[in-house]
């Protein structure tokens, strides 16, 4: 099938094809369709509610983080929290998720409007990342935790085992990238702090020349800065990478 967009005659046909790739067949075709529908389609259901993959993406992101955390906890019993967190950050970053999506050729199945498709939407790394997270959420809704755990473990455990050394943290990677490209070093700005003292949330921003600004939130400044750096690296990669 290569990189040719898949043309299904029905959702059942699409379900049959994808089931052979992911080793899971959806009981509810509608859940699969929602997981593959890009927001550009502006699809609405009988209740006039917008149906696309964004809600399932939100769910799938949390499920992926949980299962990958459990995999790392099992594989690296002697490592401290900080080291495990660095491994997880690398395993659940946008680039890794998009690479898994490319391995299963998920872009061929994303449903989007003509404009998005003509602009390379089926190869866009962010679209691939979002659709795969939505697919993970959909497998959980349709088939339960055991099935989604099987899918995530298949595609992430070997990656985790292959991490012979700790990955570089996103802040260091971003700093090295700016130095290499002769740009000012990234500055992390605290935009706001919300929530009670015992459970605060920090919003951090970074602005890189020619790439604009990104924002990230977390329960500590350190984690928020790492997330912001990761988002900026993904933004840079999406802007520069030719797929």
UniProtKB/Swiss-Prot annotation:
The organism's place on the tree of life at top rank: Bacteria
Gene Ontology BP terms: mRNA processing; regulation of gene expression; rRNA processing; tRNA processing
Cofactor: Mg(2+)
Keyword Calcium: no
Compartments in which it is found: Cytoplasm
Keyword Magnesium attributed: yes
Annotated EC: 3.1.26.3
Domain annotation RNase III: ranges: 15-144
Sample GO molecular function, one term: metal ion binding
Family recorded in the similarity comment: Belongs to the ribonuclease III family.
Protein name, entry field: Ribonuclease 3
Source organism: Wolbachia sp. subsp. Brugia malayi (strain TRS)
Gene: rnc
């Amino acid at each position: 099938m290569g990189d040719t967009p898949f043309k299904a005659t029905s959702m059942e046909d699409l379900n049959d094809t994808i089931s052979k790739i992911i080793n899971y067949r959806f009981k509810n075709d509608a859940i699969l369709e929602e997981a593959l529908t890009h927001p550009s389609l502006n699809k609405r259901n009988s209740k006039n509610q917008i149906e696309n993959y964004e809600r399932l993406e939100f769910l799938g992101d949390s499920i992926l983080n949980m299962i990958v955390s459990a995999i790392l906890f099992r594989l690296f019993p002697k490592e401290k929290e900080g080291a495990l967190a660095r491994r997880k950050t690398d395993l659940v970053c946008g680039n890794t998720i998009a690479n898994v999506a490319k391995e299963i050729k998920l872009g061929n199945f994303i449903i989007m409007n003509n404009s998005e498709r003509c602009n390379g939407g089926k190869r866009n790394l962010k679209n691939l990342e979002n659709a795969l997270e939505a697919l993970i959420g959909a497998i959980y809704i349709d088939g339960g935790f055991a099935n989604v755990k099987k899918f995530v473990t298949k595609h992430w455990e070997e990656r985790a085992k292959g991490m012979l050394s700790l990955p570089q943290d996103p802040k260091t990677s971003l700093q090295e990238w700016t130095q290499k490209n002769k740009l000012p070093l990234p500055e992390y700005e605290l935009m706001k702090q919300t929530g009670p003292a015992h459970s605060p949330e920090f919003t951090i921003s970074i602005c890189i020349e020619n790439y604009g600004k990104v924002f990230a939130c977390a329960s500590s400044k350190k984690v928020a800065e790492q997330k912001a750096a990761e988002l900026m690296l993904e933004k840079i990669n999406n802007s520069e990478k030719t797929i």
